């Protein structure tokens, strides 16, 4: 309504559910490859043709130039004007296969399974004294990505202690500092369940958090 451009960071949603950019009506949608079982160093950017045609290239090199003059150049049609030089060929092939694999599993099936895992583990996490789970408390309104904090402990310390228990989580800002500022927290720990995780993994997380609480009973390191 006000002429703003809507850019969606879909790195944490594209791997977990069906995405329809037409229904979202966003101007841009971006996601990374490694969160979709693909390789690092590659991602996907969707953009409405209107904006992509207006934008100037940000990198320059072979295959994106139409004509070169002494003081000016013209660019090829979309998408080539944004794909300068030798692309990450191996990464593109690998990401394509990863996306095909997820499509074969079915994004709706993945989302449904994650909801089941969330429904299993959320009550267990919510029952831990001093633990705050961020986001919807109803598993029907979330994926398997669960951000949390333990009272009085920095998420980095929590992540280190969980690692000692054999449980890998992410700790930090998660590229969402404005949201964390709104929540009035410096950072969070984040457990990410996916289609390859099980209820046994969920139980292991809960056990590791309880062990972490015991470890820090007398204060941080």
Question: Which residues does each predicted region cover?
Answer:
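Pyridoxal 5′-phosphate
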Residues: 1-221
């Amino acid at each position: 309504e006000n002429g703003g451009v809507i850019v969606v960071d879909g790195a944490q949603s594209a791997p977990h559910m069906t995405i329809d950019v037409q229904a979202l009506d966003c101007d841009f949608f971006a996601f990374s490859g490694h969160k979709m079982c693909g390789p690092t160093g590659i991602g996907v950017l969707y953009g409405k043709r209107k904006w992509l045609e207006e934008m100037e290239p940000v990198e320059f090199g072979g295959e994106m130039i139409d004509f070169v003059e002494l003081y000016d150049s013209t660019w090829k049609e979309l998408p080539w004007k944004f794909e300068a030089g030798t692309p990450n060929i191996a990464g593109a092939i690998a990401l394509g296969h990863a996306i095909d694999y997820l499509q074969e599993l079915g994004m709706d099936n993945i989302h449904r399974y994650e909801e089941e895992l969330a429904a299993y583990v959320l009550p267990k996490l919510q029952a831990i004294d001093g633990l705050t789970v961020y986001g919807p408390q109803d598993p029907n309104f979330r994926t398997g990505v669960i951000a949390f904090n333990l009272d009085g402990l920095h998420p980095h310390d929590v992540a280190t202690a969980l690692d000692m228990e054999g449980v890998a989580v992410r700790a930090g800002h998660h590229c969402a500092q404005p949201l964390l500022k709104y929540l009035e927290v410096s950072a969070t720990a984040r457990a990410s369940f996916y289609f390859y995780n099980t209820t046994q993994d969920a139980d292991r997380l809960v056990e590791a958090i309880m062990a972490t609480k015991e470890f820090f009973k007398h204060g941080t390191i």
